[in-house]
């Protein structure tokens, strides 16, 4: 009797874990960071999705700090809807210029397709969170 209950409990637990994973995997597997393309920004803006564009350079220590801060903030419930698009400062110069950004480490927040905030070289989690809130 005890063995049957344990097998039954194990089977129920296994099914529950499978269903939990099947439902949550698509949500959890969304990338925090996507490479920037104009088509992707347009699609997100048209859907009303909040967007943060990060102008980033791999050699930039400020950019690396910003990325760590964003990796901590974006999974939080408050910010989960925000999509992060990364512009390569060195490889996408035309995009950098189209945003009017003079420096790497520029963060630009969009809400309903409109720019609502911008910062350059900001590394404070509190201030970056304030910028993210503008896009919500």
Feature-to-residue mapping (PLM):
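Extracytoplasmic/secreted envelope proteins and their assembly/folding machinery
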Residues: 38, 42, 67-71, 93, ...
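Structural micro-motif
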Residues: 93, 99-108
